[in-house]
UniProtKB/Swiss-Prot annotation:
It comes from Rhizobium meliloti (strain 1021) (Ensifer meliloti). It is found in: Cytoplasm. One of its GO terms (molecular function) is nucleotide binding. This is Sarcosine oxidase subunit beta. Belongs to the SoxB family. Its cofactor is FAD; FMN. The gene is soxB.
Length: 416
């Protein structure tokens, strides 16, 4: 069924009794050309582009829980492409361009809202760094504007300009950045992949990877053995655990990243604002709630919840940027498991094990990269060679010394 204003109207008049399920609930087949482990945004996007762009439809997406129960539904919904380094900039700009046409592409309302992302700066050195970043963006054809104090104050008068410990000097603005409804992204890709013949198999946990003569031939699951010609791992924070089933150790640590939403408030934040003197970012949802987050919890964990020390740290940073937040009540919080790589950049590559491919190490950048990640991973699986914008995301770059360290923090995953 194709969604349209007319179909919504007609089904509403009929009591919404004639809607077809958005995707099937198939039983697994004995063998697939490609099995994708992980039914999150990246896994579903990979399946969608494999079918749509490369004509490979004998594909299964295996999800141990329900579709969208992982990180794709546990983030703060921000999209942007304001990256500095050559390895990152073209890739995230590809993702931004795919976001811009996504709803028309898969005929699903993902609520893409390009309302701008503003990164505040608070010192001369930070201003110079943002100027450099903005110039690099513009050289790659990405929009960027450097705003000074008066322009920022006119745009966001509720920020603390008069009594701030770290005075606001200005900000770097990307107007094409914004937010997207994260659940709708998972549902849209799932619906699009399923309509092209992909099997989305929920409540099917991978418990082992079967190898024969040094190559992967399938996976052991809670629903039995399923064979495959190629196995693609897109398991986010659980990537290390799944790869270990094949005897592969990854340069990745898993950390919890918490996110929060407040009570509904009168609209006052038009776009996304990030605090340059602390790790804090905030936007306002359609319901009026403030959606915000900050640093990861600094210890390794696979729990989808965090600790109170980080909650306090995030609240302090938010209050320093917007003093009025001190009176706002938090409704709920949640956590996602971040696959933190050694240099803060992702891995999209084949592994040393034949027929085993990896999509992992996304750190904070996973959600905003969803379309490009799926497209580039599908290209790798279909063609056997990396897509040009993802060519730098090799697994062996740590051994070769070709790191993509956007923040310049060195080989310490919990700092990226």
């Amino acid at each position: 069924m194709r969604y349209s204003a007319l179909s919504i109207l007609l089904n509403g008049l009929r009591g919404n009794r004639n809607w077809a399920p958005a995707w099937r609930q198939p039983d697994p087949k004995p063998h697939y050309d490609v099995i994708i482990v992980g039914g999150g945004g990246h896994g579903l996007a990979t399946a969608y582009y494999l079918a749509k762009e490369f004509g490979i439809t004998n594909v299964a997406v295996l999800e141990k829980n329900y579709i969208g129960s992982g990180n794709v539904g546990r983030n703060t919904t921000i999209i942007r492409s304001n990256y500095l380094l050559p390895g990152n900039n073209p890739f995230y700009e590809l993702s931004m361009k795919l976001w811009e046409g996504l709803e028309q592409d898969f005929n699903f309302n993902a609520m893409v809202s390009q309302r701008g992302v503003l990164n505040l700066f608070h010192s001369d050195a930070q201003r110079d760094a943002y100027t450099r970043r903005g110039n690099a963006m513009r050289l790659h054809g990405v929009d960027a504007e450097l705003l000074y104090r008066a322009a920022v104050r006119k745009m966001l008068p509720f920020l603390d300009f008069d009594n701030a410990r770290f005075p606001i000097q200005g900000g770097l603005l990307q107007r094409r950045g914004g937010t997207v409804r994260h659940d709708a992204v998972a549902w849209g890709y799932a619906r699009g992949a399923d309509s092209r013949g992909v099997d989305i198999i929920q409540n099917c946990e991978v418990t082992g990877i079967r190898r024969e003569n040094g190559r992967v031939i399938g996976v052991e699951t809670s629903r039995g053995f399923i064979g495959c010609a190629k196995l693609a791992l897109a398991a986010a924070g659980n990537s290390s655990q799944v790869a270990e089933m094949a005897g592969l150790r990854l340069p990745i640590e898993s950390h919890v990243l918490q996110a929060f939403v407040s009570e509904g408030l009168k609209p006052f934040i038009d776009g996304v604002v990030t605090f340059g003197a602390g790790h804090f970012y905030v936007s306002q949802s359609d319901k009026g709630g403030l959606v915000f987050g900050g640093d990861i919890d600094g210890y390794n964990s696979y729990a989808q919840r965090g600790n109170l020390a980080t909650v306090e740290h995030v609240a302090e940073a938010g209050k320093a940027m917007i003093p009025a937040l001190s009176r706002v009540r938090v409704l709920r919080s949640w956590g996602g498991i971040m696959d933190m790589s050694m240099d803060g950049s992702p891995i999209i590559d084949r592994t040393p094990i034949d027929n085993l491919y990896l999509n992992a190490g996304w750190c904070y950048g996973g959600f905003k990269a969803t379309p490009a990640s799926g497209f580039c991973f599908a290209h790798l699986l279909a063609r056997g060679a990396p897509q040009k914008t993802a060519a730098a995301f090799r697994l062996d770059r740590f051994e070769r010394g070709f790191l993509i360290d956007e923040k310049g923090q060195g080989a310490q995953p919990n700092l990226h």
